[in-house]
């Protein structure tokens, strides 16, 4: 019995002296839900970066880009986020003013987007143009302009996203303001008759559309490429409007917390190269903003090209966003 006790003690002593398994360094990325879905870029981006960094990537999802910024403001300096991925240029002035983001410190030579957007904090990773996407089997004669969309048949419904939580919803708000100016409130009143519902994020809206709940949805000119490549159908189409289509440039940035984690800067640099950019066209269904190692899928050649690009300067969006959201609320709640 005494011998057994001695052997047992010796075994625990050896275990206690054995070196603990080395825990991998972790990078926490806040992003939107469609990015981390099984069909989104997240899984492949995670796999590619983890091979390069020998680390663990932890994605934390919110409904959409505006919700990401709102969450970070609530968490403040106590946030667990090293990187926030999914903001866009419409939010940069407000995000910078929060004081929760740090300069990227990376070379952005490979980054190229319409308008040559450059920023010391916010790094573009993709871009696209907002568009009305429609089901050609249910709607053979869709609205051919924003004016026709606003003033058309109320029986032909569209699903939109909330500008308070979703960057596409904010994009639609700014699209309407770009075209209608001071008459945007009146235009929203007319359009409201066609709105089936307003969802918190893009995923919910597009899901309702593909389930047949509505023949139209606010999405991107690139969205039909998914259906062409994956589903082998050209049933779903996007529209380029003569008034122009509103541009979205999606961005990522490291937080002030993340700036203390060397993996954050490493990820931002990785994001501008093929390991990230090659994943974007056929998972996020947007145009890549950085260096790729292969051409775009052939389906992208069939997509409509905007006749005019619309984009309100970030400082003007920051100055007026609350006012314009209230205008939308007042017009659509009547």
From Swiss-Prot:
Q: Which GO terms describe its cellular component?
A: outer membrane-bounded periplasmic space
**Where in the cell is the protein located?**
Periplasm
In which broad location class does this protein mainly occur, judging by the first location in its UniProt entry? Answer: periplasm
Q: Which InterPro entries match?
A: SBP, ThiB, ThiB-like
| Annotated Gene3D superfamilies | Periplasmic binding protein-like II (3.40.190.10)
Taxonomic superkingdom:
Bacteria
Q: A Gene Ontology molecular-function term?
A: thiamine pyrophosphate binding
Here the disulfide bonds are: none
Amino acids binding thiamine: 64-65, 166-167, 202, 220-223
Q: Which family does it belong to?
A: Belongs to the bacterial solute-binding protein 1 family.
Q: Subunit structure, briefly? A: The complex is composed of two ATP-binding proteins (ThiQ), two transmembrane proteins (ThiP) and a solute-binding protein (ThiB).
Instruction: Name the PANTHER family on file.
Output: THIAMINE-BINDING PERIPLASMIC PROTEIN, THIAMINE-BINDING PERIPLASMIC PROTEIN-RELATED
Q: What is this protein called?
A: Thiamine-binding periplasmic protein
What species is this protein from? Brucella suis biovar 1 (strain 1330)
Q: What is the lineage of its organism?
A: Bacteria, Pseudomonadati, Pseudomonadota, Alphaproteobacteria, Hyphomicrobiales
């Amino acid at each position: 019995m005494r011998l057994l006790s001695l052997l047992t003690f010796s075994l625990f002593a050896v275990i206690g002296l054995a070196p603990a398994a080395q825990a991998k360094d972790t990078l926490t990325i806040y992003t939107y839900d469609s990015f981390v879905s099984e069909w989104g870029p997240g899984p492949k981006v995670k796999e590619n970066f983890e091979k390069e960094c020998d680390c663990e990537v932890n994605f934390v999802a919110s409904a959409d880009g505006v919700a990401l910024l709102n969450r970070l403001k609530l968490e403040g300096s106590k946030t667990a986020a090293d990187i926030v991925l999914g903001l866009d240029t419409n939010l940069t002035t407000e995000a910078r003013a929060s004081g929760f983001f740090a300069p990227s410190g990376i070379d952005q030579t490979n980054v190229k987007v319409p308008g040559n957007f450059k920023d010391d904090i916010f790094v573009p990773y993709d871009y696209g143009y907002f568009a009305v996407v429609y089901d050609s089997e249910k709607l053979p004669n869709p609205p051919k302009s924003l004016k026709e969309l606003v003033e058309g048949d109320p029986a032909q419904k569209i699903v939109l996203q909330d500008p308070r939580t979703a960057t596409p919803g904010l994009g639609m708000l700014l699209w309407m303001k770009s075209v209608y100016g001071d008459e945007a409130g009146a235009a929203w009143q007319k359009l409201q008759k066609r709105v089936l519902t307003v969802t918190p994020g893009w995923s919910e809206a597009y899901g309702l559309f593909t389930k047949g709940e509505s023949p139209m949805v606010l999405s991107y000119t690139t969205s039909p490429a998914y259906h062409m490549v994956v589903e082998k159908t050209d049933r779903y189409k996007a529209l380029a409007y003569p008034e122009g289509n509103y541009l979205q440039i999606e961005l990522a940035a490291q937080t002030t917390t993340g700036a203390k984690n060397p993996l954050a800067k490493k990820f931002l640099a990785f994001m501008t190269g093929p390991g990230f950019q090659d994943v974007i066209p056929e998972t996020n269904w947007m145009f890549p903003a950085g260096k790729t190692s292969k051409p775009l899928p052939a389906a992208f050649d069939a997509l409509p090209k905007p006749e005019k690009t619309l984009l309100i300067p970030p400082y003007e969006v920051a100055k007026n966003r609350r006012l314009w959201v209230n205008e939308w609320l007042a017009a659509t709640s009547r």
